[in-house]
Amino acid sequence: MSTLKVVSSKLAAEIDKELMGPQIGFTLQQLMELAGFSVAQAVCRQFPLRGKTETEKGKHVFVIAGPGNNGGDGLVCARHLKLFGYNPVVFYPKRSERTEFYKQLVHQLNFFKVPVLSQDEGNWLEYLKPEKTLCIVDAIFGFSFKPPMREPFKGIVEELCKVQNIIPIVSVDVPTGWDVDKGPISQPSINPAVLVSLTVPKPCSSHIRENQTTHYVGGRFIPRDFANKFGFEPFGYESTDQILKL
């Protein structure tokens, strides 16, 4: 059987729909928790604290969360990073009103004393300085993004593009400004230092700079027969790892 290493946006949506359908029964909250946990593990793998000075350990992981599910992954990621000993700060400029669940994610961040900045707080630009920030997590838009990019996110991404060569950016599933199938079609668009594909890589991942972007897959929640049904082989995660470097 021929296998695919990537799935289109249409197929990715079908996978999510079936996982959350009545026969399998995953909830969005469960999948988001596992996805955000895997992104946090990728940050830990790529930017380990072991052996770092106290000054380096004190740097922030700046998580920028969009209004949809990609942003929810970022909120979950920030909570786990706090538990892993990192110093996350979340910028959540346009909060989701879809369900109570997103509000609960913010309440959890407050419980763990993770700062959550709003659009009105102009000091978010202070976290785009390499002396203050270890890395930036781009959890703005995912595989459902369609251009044009609107404010406030257009301005935010323009600022990220100015610093992406001095502060590494970790993109969740699809780099913001990229079409999930065609790659970077929107200006501005991010060129991440790390890409964490969720469940299975999307076609846009073929456009990453192989010598400059580290690629992980995460979201370890599907068995072999389910993967084969959608035309790909499951990934060879080791032991209890939630991510695999590709």
UniProtKB/Swiss-Prot annotation:
Q: Could you tell me which Gene3D superfamilies the record lists for this protein?
A: YjeF N-terminal domain (3.40.50.10260)
Q: Which residues are (6S)-NADPHX-binding?
A: 69-73, 142-148, 173
Name the principal localization, coarsely classed.
cytoplasm
One Pfam family named in its UniProt record: YjeF_N
Q: List the EC numbers from the record.
A: 5.1.99.6
What does the miscellaneous comment read? Answer: Present with 1380 molecules/cell in log phase SD medium.
State what protein this is by name: NAD(P)H-hydrate epimerase
- Residues that bind K(+), according to the entry? 70, 138, 176
GO terms assigned for molecular function: metal ion binding; NAD(P)HX epimerase activity; nucleotide binding
Keyword Ribonucleoprotein in the entry? The reply is no
GO cellular component term, pick one: mitochondrion
What cofactor is this protein dependent on? K(+)
